[in-house]
Amino acid sequence: MNRQGSARSHLTLALCTILHGFTHAYGSMLVPLYFRIADDLKLSGVGAATLIVTLYGAVYNLASYAAGLAADRFSRKTLLAIGLLGNAAAILAIGLSRQYSHILMLGVAAGLFGTIFHPSANALASSHYPKAPGMAIGILGIGSGLGFFFGPQIAGWRAATASWQLWNVAQWQKPCVEMALAGLVVGIIFLFLGTDASGAPTRRRGAKIDPALNRRVMRMASVLMFRDFAGVAGLSLAAIYVRNVFNLHVSQAGLFVGIMMLPSVIFNPLAVYLTPKRRRLPGLTMILIIGGLLAGTAPLWPLAGALIILCAFQTMQLASYAVSDAATLERISPEFRGRVVGLFLEIAGTFGALGPWVMGAWADHLHNSHTRFNYFGPFALISACMILAAASPPLIARLGPVLSAIKPMEEISPETMGVVP
């Protein structure tokens, strides 16, 4: 194994993980700020504030197949850098705009750049580690936990404590400005230090994908979309729930939402490692069912108990992404991975993106939004969606056999983590 190539691959995977963190931080940072956004912009309710995140997520996923086509043809490293730089620029503009309509349009722009990440990053990470694509995806998944943790936490903290003044920037906008500037710096660093897999051309004609494979991916996505809805909806519902029921301050709500996501930093790669080969799909079924059962009990608990339950739910929820992504990409030839990820997200992710708006509108129409037992309905919906998604493993299996079998205790050994020669 070429040591220089190995170092480049390790660095690229580490940087992709950081980019993953920024991508999800930008997508979740407004969640604890819903009430401040609604008050500052004089909106009709929290549902109008959630529409910003809903539009971001909808565009992020609707354009995923086009992003997948690009990932299978052009330099994935360059695409990832462009994606983060554009996403950060749009978030910066959100932090400077005072018009709700402009902010909605900027949410769309941020989603268009954000959509580049998953098709390109999943394909790039797995192509750097062809002997252990599952573990590469598991490590990449650490970034989602970091982003979902730091995004809401930093947003809530800085919205409460930032003291700098610039034009008419509101308190809730200050974390947007700060995190956008950080993303611009990281995007430039990645552009110069990230690498495509050795020997991969920077521009290539995409191999023609089998229409039957597309149909199998669409069937899989039509079931896993309920998992995606549960995760995105659960994040927004948690922020609304703790603000209304437990009267948490914006910084406390941000910390609550962030802590919910933190264990996935460890559990995502661990879940992939503990479910190799034939364990992968049964493990996914178990993760989805446990997560669904946990979510339905959230309104039964006081604040501390709700934190534990929702933390466990989101750990299962995010782990299901790492495991299902690994199970899928292990069955897909490298030249098709960008398009497969893009097609999946276009269906499952777009449906999931409706979650924030559905939860915000539901909360606005509750008879008494400050009583925790009135939230049984929304949490039951999330629970049911997770359990429905547990029907997905047989559909993943129909994608085909695992292309490169890795023994359980070898998946993260130096030999199997070898890079493309």
Predicted regions and their residues:
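Residue-level signature of mid-helix packing/kink "hotspots" within the transmembrane helices
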Residues: S28, G57-Y65, F148-F149, M261-P269, ...
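Extracytoplasmic gate region of multi-pass secondary transporters
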Residues: L30-V31, R216-V265
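Conserved MFS/SLC helix-loop-helix module at the cytosolic interface between two early adjacent transmembrane helices
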Residues: L62-R98
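Helix-to-loop junctions at the C-terminal end of transmembrane segments
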Residues: A63-S75, F267-R279, A363-D364
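Cytoplasmic membrane-interface "Motif A"-like loop-to-helix N-cap segments
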Residues: R73-L84, P276-L288
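Cytoplasmic helix-loop-helix junction between adjacent transmembrane helices
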Residues: L106-S144
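Helix-loop-helix hairpin linking two adjacent transmembrane segments in secondary transporters
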Residues: I139-T195
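C-terminal transmembrane helical hairpin of 12-TM major facilitator-type secondary transporters
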Residues: L281-S324
